A protein has these predicted regions:
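Extended non-catalytic scaffold regions that mediate assembly and binding
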Residues: 1, 28-36, 45-52, 100-101, ...
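Disulfide-bonded cysteine-rich modules in secreted/extracellular proteins
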Residues: 4-11, 15, 65-80, 145, ...
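Amphipathic, heptad-repeat alpha-helical segments
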Residues: 16, 74-95
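Charged, low-complexity interaction regions
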Residues: 20-28, 41-46, 91-96, 113-117
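Repeat-associated, polar segments at repeat-unit boundaries in modular proteins
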Residues: 42-74, 119-146
């Protein structure tokens, strides 16, 4: 579990660097994001990296002021990753109850809703959602569960 979190954190940092650089310079990040997706292909964080880099790509056209946006997005990202990290410990070690999942979903949703009126609202909503999806993917993988409930939401 610790290795998974370290890998996810490293991948997030690499994607964040591309995202921040692209927002500041206006450079097209498609190739850099594709290289990151290739780098993590076949690893446990492949789905997470794919989803996160796509969010970053989708957000770039929405950014009006890179400095303000990136400061807000960094704060959101740190909060979301803390939910991810704390929840992953439970996902990797225990059977999850509906109450456990509801707490994770609420914690992630609260971050999205608390940024509803900010420039980073789409980033906050999307990133918090992929964290819940990623935790579910890992839980299913670890416990060999085949149902993909999130495909029906």
């Amino acid at each position: 579990m610790d290795n998974y979190i370290k890998t996810a954190l490293r991948a997030t940092g690499e994607a964040w660097t591309v995202f921040k650089t692209s927002a500041s310079t206006g450079q097209n990040p498609k190739l850099a994001f594709q290289q990151l997706r290739e780098k993590y292909k076949g690893t446990d964080v492949e789905g997470y990296v794919t989803d996160y880099t796509k969010i970053c790509e989708e957000e770039l056209p929405r950014i009006k002021n890179a400095e303000t946006y990136m400061a807000q997005a960094k704060d959101v990202g740190n909060k979301v990753f803390q939910v991810f990290k704390a929840s992953a410990k439970k996902v990797f070690t225990d059977e999850m109850t509906d109450d456990d999942w509801n707490r994770i979903i609420k914690a992630a949703s609260d971050i999205g809703y608390s940024n509803w009126d900010s420039e980073v609202k789409e980033y906050a909503k999307s990133y918090s959602a992929i964290v819940v999806w990623e935790l579910d993917r890992q839980y299913q993988r670890i416990h060999n569960i085949r149902e993909d409930w999130y495909k029906y939401v």
